[in-house]
Amino acid sequence: DAQETVGQSGRPGVILSLSDGRRIDLSAREGKIGAGEEVVNHPENKQLFYAADQGGEKISRMNRLDVPQGAEYHLVLSDGTRVWMNARSRLVYPVAFGDTREVELEGEAYFEVTRDENRPFIVHAGQVAVKVLGTEFNVNTCRKQKVQTVLVKGSVQVENGGKREVVLRPGELAETVGT
C-alpha cells in the first residue's frame, strides 16, 4: 500500500479498505460508512458493525481492516461473529457471507463465532486454517513462522496446509510452525 491514511493525531489510524478501493480512517469517521454498505462505525468505542446477513448478496465484496501499532478495534461481522483485533493486525473478510464463512488474519485477534451448523467459520493465517462451528478462541500470527491458536470455549480444528489436523478442547493451545 503506497497510500497511507493519517488520523487526527498525526499517526496512522485504524484503516478500513473497502472493496472499491476507498480507504477510510475510522478514528476520524462516525456513523454509516459507504453507499450501499450497511456498516456503522463508533470510533469512541473502537467498534465497527456490519448489518445482519440477509443471505441475498451473491457477489463477494471483500473489505480489509488494518489496526496499527498502539491501537485495537472491535468488529462485528455480518453473521454476528465478534472479532477483537490487537495492534499491528489485519483482517480480510467479506461484507456479507455466502455459502462459506472465511476470513484471513495477519497479527492477533480474538473471535467469538456465531454458531451456524451449515456454514463453518474458517480463519486462514498463512498456511494454517482454524475451522469452527461456534466458539471462542484467539489466533496469533505475530511470532515469525508460527501461528498460535488458543481455545477458550467450544472446539476448533487446526490444519497446517491440509497436512495435519488437530482438534483443541477448551484451555488447549496449538502452535503451528511454517506459516
Named regions from a protein language model:
Residues D1-K146, E159-G178:
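Short acidic/polar, Gly/Pro-enriched loop/turn segments located at secondary-structure boundaries
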